[in-house]
Amino acid sequence: MKEIIIDPITRLEGHGKIAIFLNDAGEVENAYLQIPELRGFEKFCIGRKAEDMPLLTSRICGVCPVAHHMAGTKALDTAFNVEPPEPAKKLRELMYCGYFIYDHTLHFYYLGGPDFVVGPDAPPEKRNILGVIEKAGLDVAKEVIKHRAYGQRITEIIGGKATHPVCGLPGGISKPLSEENRQEIEKMATSAVEFAKFSLKLFHDIVLKNTRYVELIKSDAYTLRTYYMGLVDEHNKVNFYDGKIRVVTPDGREFAKFEAKDYLEHIAEHVEPWTYVKLPYLKKVGWKGFVDGPDSGVYRVGPLGRLNAAEGMATPLAQEEYELMYKTLGGKPVHSTLAYHWARLIELLYASERAVELVKDPEITSTNVRNKPGEPGEGVGVVAAAR
């Protein structure tokens, strides 16, 4: 048996390596994605002040700290038995839209773009962000950099810092939004809508008009029939910041819908000796190993997971593209892993549209941004992370 090691892996957040094992005929027998770093957050957070959790847990990741910060903040809301005022909820969600704008822009153009935009036949040394710039042009590169910065600026204005925000408090946030900052965010969010539309057009022109790409997306090699999980609002539309957790089966039927506080009734974790990452699965289905299908408890999250678990998008332009994706790829749910890139751009458009809605809300500059915490207890918080 022959072993091939790829270490380190590039184009991902964090550290990882891939181990591939070939049989005597030279065919792949097994392949493992290994996460070799021990993080230890679950241990060193024990005994710390609850109020420190949004700041400590945001250090889990430098790319998606907003998700960890906001999940921790929402856990404090329930732990201190306090409901934030509506203006505070809207400001939190607006900051969260900024996070999705910069994260989805980063992922599509920097991490996914080298394969789609540059092309799978390009030499490895060309499949990077510089190759994307060379293929798409310098003007496109400038727009990518600008709108990623816009997302970070929105996060910074509300969160206090673009990376590792510091605004979350039990019962609200640390400061209101000034009219001057509101106008700045409105301009950036409006521009982000146009950028998202442009990004989808680029995807249509380069990917969907190429028969080979579409065949690759639909191919069995990139198909996994799993359960899907996502956060949805009261109408089962995609929501990043709030709502219930919805799970659908591989054929699209609702399997479960529950509050964050009940997550341990539905989700368990499996441990393997070759990786430090725990492997969540649906408790009521059970762990059957690394297999797909309705009898396996494996489920997927992220952009495609959310779109499959929901019944639509809550903004008009994103809804149009949502319907087009399922029509093009043969109905719902879509099981193609490569469709994550299309779903990501649909969410980029939704985040931008939603940011415009929120920043134009008359309550967004209200000074009523925090309610007094109540008696302390236990709390669980959930948000949808971008990846």
PLM regions and their residue ranges:
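Active-site bordering "gate/hinge" segments
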Residues: 1-387
